[in-house]
Structures are given as C-alpha cells and as structure tokens.
Amino acid sequence: MPPSSRIAMWSGPRTVSTALMRAWENRPDTTVTDEPLYAFYLARTGLAHPGRDQVIASQSTDWRVVLAEQTGAPLPPGVSIGYAKHMTHHLLPEVDRAALAPLRHAHLIRDPRELLNSYARVRAEPEVDDLGLRQQAEIFETFGGPVVDSRDLLADPEPVLRALCRALDVPFDTAMLSWPPGPRDSDGVWAPYWYDSVHASTGFAPYRPPAEPLPARLEPLADRCLPYYQRLYQYRIS
C-alpha cells in the first residue's frame, strides 16, 4: 500500500456509485463513507432534497471538518483503506481544492443521455450542475486518477475492478464481486429515499440500455454535458 490509503471516488447521480461503494465495503480491509459533503452542500445551497433536515443533522456542514476527517482521522483497527463515495456537485467552489490533495482520486462516469434518462424521473427539469459532469472534469484536471465508465463496470465487473485496484495500487479482492442484500450502517440517512434497488442487490446488475429514448426536451442538456463526459471517457480503464 502507498502512504495514502484514502480513496475519493467521484461521480454524479445515477451512476451505480452506491453499488460500487458496496463492492468496496465488502472487502475486510476497507471502511467506507457515504457522501460526506452532502450536508455541507444542502446547507450552502438551500436545496430541498428528500430528507434534507435529517441529512443536515447527520453530518458536519463545515467542509473543513469533513475533509480533515477524510484526510487525517485514523482508520479503524485492521483496516488499511478508507473509501469515500463523493458526489461531484457537492464540491462547491468555496471548498479549498488543496485540502483534497492527500486523497487518492478516482472517477465513475456515465453517458449523460443514459444518466439524464434516469435522473429526470426524479427531477423533471435538471440543470447542468445537477449532473456533476462539469465539476467532475474540473476535479479530473486537478487531480487525475483512474476513470471507470459505469457501462463497462456493469458489462464485465471483474476485469474493470481488477484494473481499478491496480490503478489505485491496492490488491484486488474477489469479495468486491458480490455482497449480502440489505441496508448498511454506513448508508447515509437518505438511503430510504434512494437505495431501494441497492438494498435488494447482491452484486452488479447486468448492463441494460434505457428502455425509453431520452425526451426531446433534454437533448440540449445532454449535448451540453457530452464534452465533459467525453473528456473523461477517453481515459477510462477497461
């Protein structure tokens, strides 16, 4: 293991990020944190997300406290990897990017047309910054790190996970390929609103293309997001 064993996995919504967190949590050498900047994001933006008050009560709303914990707090006994699932849009401009330097960064991406097709069922009129691809491109430009495309991950999990572990300089563990169903103590308090399918899962579901075409009204938004996605996609591991 390199000196830094703290992994920050950056993604937008609807990218199988929680399933990937499950894969890491199923390793005996890893502890996970679920979206530690979420309360900060909600407190600063004033957005009315499901369970907003619960989220804000469950975490620090000071990004300095959050990142000090993520970069400096001791890992539990017997654990050598700290893995944090981060939403890219939670990283607001006021957060000092230098505070993220001790972390080992990685990225999970999804074709914006597929992402929008799923996300629009929850929020009918999303905006560019809701999807996080612009912010993710900025994080990638600053810190680099391996890139995983969610379609590749679902289509053939083991080789993609092996390549990801290799890129992060940690050993692959077959425990990442499946996990027991149900909730986890590590799940954020927002889990009842978002995690039903993950709670029912025991592994990565096979890739399936969207059943319906992207609504025409969302095509311009997908086109705006596409260059950010393509920027990261060219570096994806396989």
Predicted feature locations:
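PAPS-dependent sulfotransferases, especially Golgi type II membrane carbohydrate sulfotransferases
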Residues: M1-I7, T174-S238
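PAPS-dependent sulfotransferase catalytic core
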Residues: M1-P76
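A generic structural signal for alpha->beta connector loops
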Residues: R27-T30, S80, P102, G144
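Generic structural signal for helix capping and beta-alpha/helix-loop junctions
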Residues: F40-L42, L115, G182
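A basic- and aromatic-enriched beta-loop-alpha substructure that forms the phosphate/nucleotide-
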Residues: R52-I109
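Soluble or luminal CAZymes and related metallo-dependent hydrolases
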Residues: S58-V66, T88, V128-Q135, D156, ...
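A structural motif corresponding to the C-terminal end of an alpha-helix
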Residues: P77, I139-G145, Y228-R231
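PAPS-dependent sulfotransferase catalytic domain
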Residues: A84-A175, P192-Y195, A200
